[in-house]
Design a protein with these regions (language model features):
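OB-fold and OB-like single-stranded nucleic-acid-recognition modules
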Residues: 1-175
Length: 175
């Protein structure tokens, strides 16, 4: 039984079940990145929320989330494609959510069935960009299940990072 967390609504329901309500980002942010007490407020927020969610059922759920990828090269030895991967950022009423795998293997290879492999090889050889999505399946790491932080790109933008121990990876070709 998996909880599929790939759109704002499903992610918000998941966060509601874990932490009930979003933090008061403005209060935590205070006077911004240069506020000397910001790190301490974030640390306190994360520790308090960790303690409150201890033992909650969603910590045991198997979750599915997506990362994006672009095929980079074909390897004839494996019959598969290397790829460049990265997180998908989802805007929610809680803030921006970016799932964070505990460990991302650096050697992920997509090995499609032969007919698809040839189509993808031709597309790459023609200089076309080939995007796929990576469905990662796993469970939250209870001790660090959600990390609250702020964007380094946009002042005051709250970021929530569910930290997931990955159990399985599936590749989805976008058509």
């Amino acid at each position: 039984d998996c909880h599929i967390l790939i759109n704002p609504h499903s992610i918000e329901q998941f966060l509601d079940a874990l932490d009930r309500s979003p933090p008061d980002w403005g209060l935590v942010y205070g006077h911004g990145h240069h506020d000397p007490a910001l790190d301490e407020r974030l640390f306190t927020l994360n520790r308090e929320r960790d303690a409150k969610r201890n033992g909650k059922e969603p910590l045991q759920w198997t979750v599915v989330f997506l990362w994006s990828a672009e095929l980079s090269r074909y390897d004839p030895t494996t019959g598969g494609f290397g790829m460049a991967i990265g997180p998908i950022f989802t805007q929610t009423k809680w803030g921006i959510v970016r799932f964070k795998p505990e460990e991302v293997p650096s050697n992920l290879v997509v090995i499609p069935e032969p007919s698809t492999r040839e189509v993808l090889r031709r597309q790459l050889e023609a200089g076309q960009k080939v995007d796929i999505e990576i469905a990662m399946v796993g469970r939250l790491i209870p001790e660090e299940s959600l990390v609250y932080d702020f964007s380094h790109d946009e002042e005051g933008l709250g970021i929530i990072m569910p930290v997931v121990r990955i159990e399985r990876v599936e590749y989805l070709l976008l058509r």
